[in-house]
């Protein structure tokens, strides 16, 4: 078990621009906010926000995770965000909307989901 030591001091740097990487899978949504060089400033996920099981894959869980990551990024002084969205999950748009609602100026949204140019054979279709 991790012990609760002294609180982490967040040094307010002169970082005004950042990148929000949103990885939205079918099971979870992970949000990482970095500076322009790619150094992670804050992160949150639906699972780390207290959602378990099928509730992790909901848009509301992605919204809560984005609010947590955005609140920490605000302490660093970030105002403008580029958003890079990866994956087909249900939390894609709600995470972007909640970052916008926190007061970040979203400069652009880029979909970086990898698409094969007829590469590997996909897994077989599910029969439910």
UniProtKB/Swiss-Prot annotation:
SUPFAM superfamilies: Translational machinery components (SSF53137). One of its GO terms (molecular function) is rRNA binding. The keyword Repressor does not apply. InterPro entries: Ribosomal_uS11, Ribosomal_uS11_bac-type, Ribosomal_uS11_CS, Ribosomal_uS11_sf. Belongs to the universal ribosomal protein uS11 family. Part of the 30S ribosomal subunit. Interacts with proteins S7 and S18. Binds to IF-3. NCBIfam families: PRK05309.1, uS11_bact. Located on the platform of the 30S subunit, it bridges several disparate RNA helices of the 16S rRNA. Forms part of the Shine-Dalgarno cleft in the 70S ribosome. This is Small ribosomal subunit protein uS11. The gene is rpsK.
């Amino acid at each position: 078990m991790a012990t609760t030591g002294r609180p982490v001091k967040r040094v307010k740097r002169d970082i005004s621009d950042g990148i929000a990487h949103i990885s939205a899978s079918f099971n979870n949504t992970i949000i990482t906010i970095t500076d322009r060089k790619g150094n992670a400033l804050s992160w949150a996920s639906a699972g780390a926000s207290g959602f378990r099981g099928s509730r992790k894959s909901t848009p509301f869980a992605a919204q809560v995770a984005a609010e947590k990551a955005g609140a920490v990024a605000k302490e660093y002084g970030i105002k403008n965000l580029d958003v890079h969205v990866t994956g087909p999950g249900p939390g894609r748009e709600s995470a972007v909307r909640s970052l916008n609602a926190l007061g970040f100026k979203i400069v652009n949204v880029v979909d970086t989901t990898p698409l094969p140019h007829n590469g590997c054979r996909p897994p077989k279709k599910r029969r439910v």
